[in-house]
């Protein structure tokens, strides 16, 4: 069994981790921390976990992770980087679901996240946890930087075109939509029911924190810098990401064959039949990314549709997928949930 600790177990990502790991046949939850809920039973806070988890939340300043093999951080940005070094020094592996170790250029990270990085020496070591790209590196990693929700959907949508050198990489467009759970569980005006319901809006058009992460990943696949216009939107649904991606083709290519070939052996990327239009509900509660490719009127623009659940493939599910790879387990173990309908 893999003994697991979770730092920050009360947010939406944290409770999704709990839901998945409580059912994982090779994982045993040992420690779950929360500053505000220390001493509270996990199942008292989340009734969905009654009969599944009997642990209480622990004070993160008093907890001992010595019995853990791996620790997940489901914390706000800036927390993991303060604690990871000590855990690694004790032989404990870390999977960080925050953005602390995703961007390799520390100065760029500090610019986007507005704080000084306290563990820059670990940034180079951290492996970016997108299995469809870095599976072999993940196997031997001590520290995983779990990708963000938008970056997962956007990168998986663009990667086959980028790797094939089939598009103008200076004019990529990502028009993305997210459910309100992507904003987290904290109370904010823009996610109140009366604000988010019956409403649809764009935000962070001038620059979103996930932009440098996406650019970094796609540039690595290209071998040279790419340019991307990234516009996120908030939609009146709880969970889900829908990315509509546009790219100008530079040569003739069979998009359907390209995508089916690239993802043929990927257990969680589903390339839909030609002409399909994936729905966010088709991945709700699952670790799947479903993709459809289009070339309107056989023109020179490729339109790629990519959908994920922001809390699963965009966060907790992908983190557990990375854990499975790190420990040599079947990659699909514990994360084969069928999407919820209706």
Curated annotation (Swiss-Prot):
PROSITE patterns assigned: ARGC (PS01224)
Entry GO terms, CC: cytoplasm
Transmembrane regions listed in the UniProt entry: none
EC number: 1.2.1.38
Gene Ontology terms describing biological process: L-arginine biosynthetic process
Enzyme class, spelled out: oxidoreductase
Keywords: Amino-acid biosynthesis, Arginine biosynthesis, Cytoplasm, NADP, Oxidoreductase
Domain of life: Bacteria
Gene Ontology MF terms: N-acetyl-gamma-glutamyl-phosphate reductase activity; NAD binding; NADP+ binding
Metabolic or biological pathway: Amino-acid biosynthesis; L-arginine biosynthesis; N(2)-acetyl-L-ornithine from L-glutamate: step 3/4
Cellular location(s): Cytoplasm
Pfam family of the protein (one): Semialdhyde_dh
Record's catalysed reaction(s): N-acetyl-L-glutamate 5-semialdehyde + phosphate + NADP(+) = N-acetyl-L-glutamyl 5-phosphate + NADPH + H(+)
Keyword presence, Oxidoreductase: yes
Residue numbers annotated as active site: 149
UniProt main location, coarse: cytoplasm
InterPro entries in the record: AGPR_AS (IPR023013), AGPR_type-1 (IPR000706), NAD(P)-bd_dom_sf (IPR036291), NAGSA_dehydrogenase (IPR050085), Semialdehyde_DH_NAD-bd (IPR000534)
Biological function: Catalyzes the NADPH-dependent reduction of N-acetyl-5-glutamyl phosphate to yield N-acetyl-L-glutamate 5-semialdehyde.
HAMAP family: ArgC_type1 (MF_00150)
Family: Belongs to the NAGSA dehydrogenase family. Type 1 subfamily.
UniProt cross-references to NCBIfam families, sorted A to Z: argC
Stored PANTHER family: N-ACETYL-GAMMA-GLUTAMYL-PHOSPHATE REDUCTASE, CHLOROPLASTIC-RELATED, N-ACETYL-GAMMA-GLUTAMYL-PHOSPHATE REDUCTASE, CHLOROPLASTIC-RELATED-RELATED
Protein name, UniProt field: N-acetyl-gamma-glutamyl-phosphate reductase
Organism: Nitrosomonas eutropha (strain DSM 101675 / C91 / Nm57)
